[in-house]
């Protein structure tokens, strides 16, 4: 969702990775299948060109499958996709929390085929600003990100109170929100900066480069794009130096 607009030459800057998905994204099924191979010919719900779609494509690559072997049903609304799985309109669903938990709570026959706990650096959430805003209001962007990391620190230090407050925004209880957050590794500013500036074949930058090539090969973007074209670590550098 960052690489695609960047590949269209949109002036966006990814200023921080904020978490790694360690189970917050998954492929669910109604039929007890334990692999994507076993779902061949079935109807799979997914938001096309979303993170869930990318997860499904990567999973297909891991298992040596082609998504042409499945009937993909596009759901722009994740809640509609969850409803379709629970009611049996589709056989499987690529989705994310809190919809994973809500589906499994609604029907105990629904189970996880695969999730990102097995691929901890595959899916990240990040914060992106327009290049113009970053260039003209850098200090304000730093303040926004400082506030964000203060909120993360508050959540870590006051989990019970924070989970209750945040759960209200997702129409779930504090306990349900807490369960959802066990599937995300929330990064501090220092951890995010270290992850985004690390080098090597197993680094975050290498993963982003590989993701761009993967999307290009599958026709999801029209040109390959390097992380250096859209990643800007200057905000995190300013925060971590203070």
Mark where each language-model region is:
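Conserved C-terminal helix/tail region of periplasmic/extracytoplasmic solute-binding proteins
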Residues: 208-242
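Short phosphate-engaging motifs
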Residues: 1, 23, 35, 52, ...
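Helix N-cap/coil-helix junction residues
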Residues: 10, 33, 65-67, 172, ...
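Secondary-structure end/capping motifs
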Residues: 135-220
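Phosphate-coordinating loops and pocket residues in cytosolic domains that bind phosphorylated ligands
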Residues: 41, 105, 232
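Short, glycine-/small- and polar/acidic-enriched structural segments
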Residues: 1-66, 72-77, 91-97, 113, ...
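Pocket-lining segment of extracytoplasmic ligand-binding domains
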Residues: 73, 79-170
């Amino acid at each position: 969702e960052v690489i695609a607009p960047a590949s269209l030459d949109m002036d966006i800057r990814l200023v921080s990775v904020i978490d790694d998905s360690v189970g917050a994204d998954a492929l669910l099924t109604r039929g007890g299948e334990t692999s994507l191979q076993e779902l061949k010919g079935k109807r799979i719900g997914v938001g096309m060109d979303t993170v869930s779609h990318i997860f499904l494509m990567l999973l297909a690559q891991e298992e040596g499958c082609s998504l042409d072997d499945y009937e993909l049903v596009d759901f722009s609304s994740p809640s509609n996709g969850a409803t379709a799985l629970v009611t049996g309109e589709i056989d499987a669903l690529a989705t994310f929390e809190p919809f994973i938990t809500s589906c499994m709570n609604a029907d105990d026959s629904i189970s996880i085929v695969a999730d990102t706990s097995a691929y901890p650096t595959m899916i990240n959430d990040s914060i992106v600003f327009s290049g113009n805003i970053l260039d003209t209001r850098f200090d304000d962007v730093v303040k926004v990100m400082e506030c964000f990391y203060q909120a993360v620190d508050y959540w870590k230090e006051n989990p019970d109170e924070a989970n209750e407050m945040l759960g209200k925004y997702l129409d779930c209880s504090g306990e349900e929100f807490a369960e959802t957050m066990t599937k995300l590794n929330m990064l501090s500013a220092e951890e995010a900066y270290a992850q985004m500036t690390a080098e090597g074949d197993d680094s975050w930058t290498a993963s982003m480069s590989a993701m761009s090539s993967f999307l290009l090969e599958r026709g999801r973007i029209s040109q390959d794009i390097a992380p250096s074209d859209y990643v800007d670590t200057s905000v995190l550098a300013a925060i971590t130096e203070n």
